[in-house]
């Protein structure tokens, strides 16, 4: 088993061929982190890694002459009230007002496989041989409370997962005010922190900062989602780490609500990383025999740079986070009508768009917002999940049947968590809104948040949308969510339980997803939240793809998809070819570039094909054929490599290489044209050095060995004035091994 407990030294060694994680029981019964990094050989005793010295102002937590001080110890799960003045992973308020806790080792269990987390998404195993898990039980004798720290290490991935569970065994009521899922301490601060930040239409831009003494953090307080502003992910990399070399530690949170990812550097240059539910607005009371389970943190170690980290996340999330029929399954090429029609459509217009989609080879037609209630604009209709017969006199069932008769699958847009005040749902249940009755209810996009912390609300929405699905032939659902939670108050909860509202809301979303995916296992779900405001691992557990951003401009998507690839696999990224001028930026980019960007995702169209010229239609047909030929490689079978960063210059490049290194597809993108430009070579990655390849691009062909293509590279074509290419030029390369 790749987890060993050495009794004499009281040390746990969690390891596989990639990494080692070592923790031990200290003399005061608490847990210390000794090492996390590249795999090292197991042995009985690693106690030399414990560092202890007399320092000024230290609070010693063992009898004299001991020198153990929590302030200067790399703790496994730091708590408040034992002489550590850094931020704790756990804060518990007791009946007497005290927040002092002291959890000491009681027992542990090592077992094969991985347990499910009740009510929460998490990575999983399909056999006990795939992973080994460790539960360490600690106990606070004053509160009579157990703290269970859970670790799982996969056999074939450089991954350790972490979570924590509190179990109240005593009679007093305790209140959890801060419960992190994981904490990790490093002995130095020589790292740079990477995070993915942005806003609506520019999600997950790559940001890097050097660690400094003090606290640096990213977080979400959006309530309904992990947010566009910050993604629930951070990484620590060494300063000289590149895409392909050097150490990096990734931390990804399998959760879709408020989160905190925090890095604190002490005055002695120790680095503490913590990740979990954001304590702001969170409070959870536990009575006797009640427990609280935190979401999971997925930690990746790579000594092969940022690409190595990303590929580990991609493989794990593709293989052991996504589930069901669509796991490791290429996606259908779709056309969505939103940017073609917005709310202004009827059955005839929809059928005309669908007919043209079928002619070019599209496989799935998706009807977006506007099909239900009185939904003629975004002021009304949300919450009323019944068909607007004025637009669709034959209903969704009639429309879906006609679409299927064309030879297309049919998909539908929904926004199940929201309500307009101008709706039957609100008029019947005004108390179902999130918000305090004595406060103004802020609106966003003219809508309000339904209280999914209440089971009766989830039941109502489940029954409403299930009826629509049952009566129709639906193969795909796009589940949108277009606002944050501004006044987090539940009219269905007591004063003591208001701190549970935001977490229970997310649990309600997960409950509805669970019920719908179990009842309709063949439907492909795509999550969406004003674009990418809820692009997180928690969503991928239920919906194996996410609408990456509402910004469909090809040039902007280069940055968005590049950043998203740090954690999320290509097959999870919703990516469409849209009309020009682009509806978000009014920018015009070539049709070829729009496709060359969208290929590296789920691929589809978001425009009215009837408005294209005959030449453009032929180009679209060729694009569809290309994607059908290469989508297994791009979406399922290949490893993704970042080559040139759009955040560092005018050029972007990336590629996907098959696991056997026999096939690859690469994309190169130049943002703005340059006159009399310098020479440039594009160097591929991930190929077999000794394999002869045939490379095709545009009207050119080259035969070269893998080492040539990776180290010498291919010259990027330019002419003196570069009149041919223009702005936003791109090149697609196909690479095939020669026998």
Region annotations inferred by a language model:
Residues 5, 9-13, 17, 31-264, ...:
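Polysaccharide-binding surfaces and accessory modules of carbohydrate-active proteins
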Residues 18, 164, 289, 335, ...:
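Conserved, mostly hydrophobic/aromatic
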Residues 98-105, 284-303, 728-735:
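Short Pro-Gly-centered flexible turn/kink motifs
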Residues 672-739:
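C-terminal beta-sandwich/jelly-roll accessory domains of carbohydrate-active enzymes
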Residues 393-395, 427-429, 433-588, 602, ...:
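Active-site neighborhood of glycoside hydrolase catalytic domains
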Residues 234, 243, 646-689:
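Carbohydrate-binding surface patches
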């Amino acid at each position: 088993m790749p987890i060993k407990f050495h009794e004499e030294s009281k040390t746990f060694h969690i390891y596989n061929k990639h990494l080692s994680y070592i923790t031990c029981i200290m003399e005061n019964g608490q847990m210390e982190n000794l090492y996390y990094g590249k795999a090292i050989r197991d042995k009985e005793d690693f106690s030399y890694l414990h560092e202890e010295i007399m320092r000024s102002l230290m609070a010693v937590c063992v009898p004299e002459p001991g020198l153990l001080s929590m302030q200067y110890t790399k703790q496994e799960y730091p708590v408040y009230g034992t002489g550590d003045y850094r931020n704790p992973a756990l804060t518990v308020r007791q009946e007497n007002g005290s927040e002092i806790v002291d959890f000491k080792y009681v027992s542990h269990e090592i077992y094969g496989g991985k347990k499910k987390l009740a009510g929460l998404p998490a990575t999983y195993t399909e056999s006990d041989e795939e992973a080994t898990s460790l539960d360490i039980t600690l106990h606070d004798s004053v509160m009579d409370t157990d703290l269970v720290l859970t670790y799982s290490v996969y056999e074939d991935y450089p991954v350790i997962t972490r979570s924590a569970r509190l179990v109240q065994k005593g009679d007093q009521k305790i209140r959890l005010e801060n419960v992190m899922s994981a904490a990790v301490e490093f002995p130095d601060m020589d790292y740079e922190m990477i995070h993915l930040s942005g806003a609506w239409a520019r999600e997950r831009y790559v940001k890097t900062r050097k660690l400094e003494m003090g606290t640096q953090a990213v977080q979400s307080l959006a309530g309904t989602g992990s947010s566009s502003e910050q993604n629930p992910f951070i990484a620590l990399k060494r300063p000289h780490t590149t895409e392909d070399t050097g150490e990096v530690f990734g931390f990804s949170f399998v959760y879709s609500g408020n989160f905190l990812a925090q890095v604190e550097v002490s005055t002695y240059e120790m680095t503490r990383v913590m990740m979990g539910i954001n304590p702001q607005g969170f409070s959870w009371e536990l009575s006797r025999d009640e427990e609280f389970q935190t979401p999971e943190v997925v930690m990746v170690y790579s000594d092969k740079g940022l690409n190595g980290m990303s590929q580990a996340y991609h493989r794990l999330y593709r293989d052991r986070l996504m589930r069901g029929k669509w796991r490791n399954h290429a996606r259908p090429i779709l056309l969505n009508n939103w940017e073609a029609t917005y709310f202004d459509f009827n059955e005839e217009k929809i059928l005309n768009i669908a007919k043209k989609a079928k002619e070019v080879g599209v496989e799935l037609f998706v009807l977006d917002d506007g099909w239900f209630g009185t939904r003629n604009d975004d002021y009304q209709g949300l919450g009323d999940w019944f068909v607007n017969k004025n637009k669709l006199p034959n209903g969704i069932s009639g429309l879906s049947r006609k679409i299927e008769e064309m030879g297309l699958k049919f998909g539908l847009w929904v926004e199940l968590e929201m309500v307009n005040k101008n709706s039957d749902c609100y008029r019947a249940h005004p108390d179902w809104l999130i918000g305090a009755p004595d406060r103004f209810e802020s609106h966003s996009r003219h809508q309000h948040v339904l209280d999914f912390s209440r089971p009766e609300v989830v039941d109502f929405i489940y029954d409403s949308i299930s009826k629509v699905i049952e009566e129709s032939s639906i193969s795909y659902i796009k589940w949108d969510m277009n606002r944050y939670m501004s006044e987090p108050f539940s009219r269905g909860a007591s004063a003591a339980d208001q701190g549970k509202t935001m977490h229970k809301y997310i649990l309600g979303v997960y409950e509805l997803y669970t019920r719908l995916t179990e009842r309709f296992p063949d439907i492909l779900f795509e999550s969406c939240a004003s674009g990418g405001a809820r692009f997180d691992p928690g969503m991928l557990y239920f919906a194996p793809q996410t609408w990456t951003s509402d910004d469909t401009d090809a040039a902007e998507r280069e940055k968005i998809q590049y950043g998203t690839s740090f954690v999320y696999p290509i097959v999870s990224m919703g990516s469409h070819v849209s009309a020009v001028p682009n509806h978000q930026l009014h920018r015009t980019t070539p049709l070829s570039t729009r496709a060359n960007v969208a290929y590296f995702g789920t691929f589809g169209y978001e425009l009215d094909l009837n408005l294209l010229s005959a030449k453009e239609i032929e180009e679209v047909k060729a694009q569809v054929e290309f994607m059908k030929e290469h989508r297994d490689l791009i979406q399922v079978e290949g490893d993704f490599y970042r080559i040139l960063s759009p955040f560092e210059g005018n050029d972007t490049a990336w590629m996907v290489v098959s696991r056997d290194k026999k096939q690859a597809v690469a994309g190169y993108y130049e943002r703005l044209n340059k006159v009399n430009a310098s020479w440039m070579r594009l160097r591929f990655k991930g190929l077999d050095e000794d394999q002869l390849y045939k490379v095709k691009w545009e009207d050119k062909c080259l035969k070269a060995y893998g080492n040539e293509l990776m180290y010498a590279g291919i010259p990027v074509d330019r002419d003196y004035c570069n009149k041919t290419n223009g702005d936003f030029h791109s090149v697609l390369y196909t690479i095939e091994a020669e026998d």
